[in-house]
Amino acid sequence: MPIAIYQGHHHSLAPADINIVIDVIRAFTVAHYAFIGGAKEILLVRTADEAFALKDTYPDYVLTGEEKGVGISGFDLDNSPKRMAGQNMTDKSLIQKTTNGVTAALGALNAKHLFVTGFSNAKTTAQHVKKLVANDCVINIVASHPSGDDDMACAEYIKGIIEGTNVVTAAEAIERIKGSSVAEKFFDCRQPLFDSEDIVYCTKELTGDFVMKVKQDGEVPTIERVII
């Protein structure tokens, strides 16, 4: 059961049985909290222009995401899990555009199963994948940030659970996420656009009954909440 870890959001992945794309800080933590809040689905797009075009067609859809880490003018929400956790998303469809996680997911569609996750849903996702796999399964894990240890720590944590080696513990992953270069700006009082409480949400492991799987048979790849 070969499991490869890739870092960054621009890969040409060979066909695989399972791809897992990680964005801890913050895209797929935001997505996780959106589904906890009742969201129906999350459409993934590469650009703000694509997001606005979809919004024109579906005015009730909620735009969420970022460019260069900050919220996009004209979007309904930014990329903050703290803010998402305070929203009622019952039966809402979202459109998400982010620099790393969404871009990486859209580059990882060449798989029978594509899952996305942050750390908050990493254990649940890994345990679900472990039940799916056979000895000859090809699995790719994509740590979507090009250099940050946050996504890499989560990738190694997930890989260890699937393999049964548990080489990285949850506590170790949390410390690496908090200590990563990506997290630094959230603790910098000179950068008020980045809220340190977001890192609390990004490092809280939740027990859940669903995974986030990307549905690929429509015009726009869409994350769905799949009960396990």
From Swiss-Prot:
SUPFAM superfamilies per UniProt: ComB-like
Source species of the chain: Bacillus subtilis (strain 168)
Gene from which the chain derives: comB
The EC number(s) this enzyme carries: 3.1.3.71
Gene Ontology MF annotations: 2-phosphosulfolactate phosphatase activity; magnesium ion binding; sulfopyruvate decarboxylase activity
InterPro entries named in the record: ComB-like, ComB-like_sf
Cofactors, names only: Mg(2+)
Family to which this protein belongs: Belongs to the ComB family.
Name recorded for this polypeptide: Probable 2-phosphosulfolactate phosphatase
Catalytic activity, reaction form: (2R)-O-phospho-3-sulfolactate + H2O = (2R)-3-sulfolactate + phosphate
Keyword Cytoplasm: no
Key words of the record: Hydrolase, Magnesium
